[in-house]
A protein has these predicted regions:
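A glycine-rich, hydrophobic loop/mini-helix early in the fold
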Residues: 77-91
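Short, cationic low-complexity segments
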Residues: 90-99
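A contiguous, surface-oriented mixed alpha/beta subdomain in the mid-to-C-terminal portion of proteins
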Residues: 1-61, 65-74, 85-87, 102-324
Length: 324
């Protein structure tokens, strides 16, 4: 989004709060990922409404669907509640499990309007600040809660409002907890509709590049094992520190492998400056930056003993003044 006013991290996360595992009411909508359901017969019986972009074709792979709870009977809602709870239990063991139920949404519109809005946000065209196309168009699965959770702290409020459109409340799982994004419509009337190019919603290339690191950020957060009681704001702050470290690993230290980026980001998040500025490592950072050597991150990590890591261990609540 071009021309919007930048906000701080604390401002971007203020609309999100922890939520209990949702108990399904008789109204509202579920956003589901049909491809994540092992058995589709029960899901098909609910007649989910596919969010299909214009001229998409017949292959629905990767697309979300809407379930209107007002059209579900008590037995169907019970089945959906069982799915939600089973997925939650699975996430307690494996935090990055692909979810079938992506969100519960309140929206003052009918299912067709909501599905149409989400469909219009799925096709993205990254553009340079000059307005020129930077990359080919792509399908953006922003509705996946593993992605959406990070967008809540990455995106400016106007961009997030554009994404969720008519939704006034968006409840989603992330890692081992559930969260809700409230008050999304507060500024909706002030947000201009996104510019579209040939059926694609345009997105700034810098934002798009950041979203491409979300999977690596999530892997690092899962490895850190953040306490479930840690407030959303602290989890988002940790995610932002991880993003900064992943970017540094990729751009400054020239590590292109995900394992290197995750290892580096994990150690920065755990140990901060004690790891980054350790006398046995500082020369290696310079050599990696200038491409004089090509050590992997795991090789550099092994240069320090377990006792040393224990000595400068920090709580996993890092604060980084450079975080946007």
């Amino acid at each position: 989004m071009i021309g919007q006013t930048a906000t701080t991290l604390s401002q971007r996360v203020e609309r999100v709060s922890v939520s209990p595992v949702p108990l399904l009411p008789e109204t509202g909508y579920l956003i589901v990922d049909p491809g994540a359901f092992a058995e589709s017969d029960e899901l098909d019986s609910l007649r989910p409404l596919m969010c299909r972009p214009t001229n998409w074709g017949r292959d629905f792979t990767g697309l979300p669907a809407i379930i209107d709870l007002a059209h579900c009977d008590a037995g169907q809602r019970d089945w959906l509640a069982i799915v939600i709870n089973a997925e939650h239990e699975s996430r307690l063991r494996m935090q990055l499990t692909r979810p079938g139920v992506c969100a519960y949404v309140d929206a003052p519109v009918d299912a067709n309007t909501l599905a149409g809005h989400l469909a219009n946000q799925l096709l993205i065209l990254p553009v340079e600040k000059s307005g020129h196309r930077a990359l080919p168009g792509a399908l953006w699965r922003f509705f996946d809660p593993r992605v959406f959770a990070n967008l809540c702290w990455m995106l400016e409020p106007e961009h997030l409002t554009t994404l969720v459109g008519p939704a006034s409340r968006w409840v989603f799982p992330w890692l081992d907890s559930w969260y809700e994004c409230n008050g999304i419509l507060d500024t909706a009337s002030d947000v201009a509709p996104p510019e579209r190019i040939g059926g694609f919603a345009r997105i700034d290339i810098d934002i798009w590049d950041r979203t491409q690191r979300i999977a690596t950020i999530n892997q690092t957060l899962a490895r850190l094992g953040l306490p479930s009681e840690l407030p959303w704001q602290d989890k988002a702050a940790t995610a932002a520190v991880v993003e900064s470290a992943v970017t540094e690993a990729e751009r400054r230290l020239h590590w292109k492998q995900t394992d290197d980026q995750v290892n580096y980001a994990e150690h920065i998040a755990r140990y901060g400056a004690a790891f980054r500025n350790h006398p046995r490592l500082v020369d290696h950072w310079v050599k990696l930056e200038t491409r004089v050597e090509t050590f992997s991150c795991s090789e550099l990590i092994a240069l320090l003993s377990q006792e040393e890591y224990e000595e400068f261990a920090q709580p996993t609540r890092p604060r980084d003044p450079t975080v946007r």
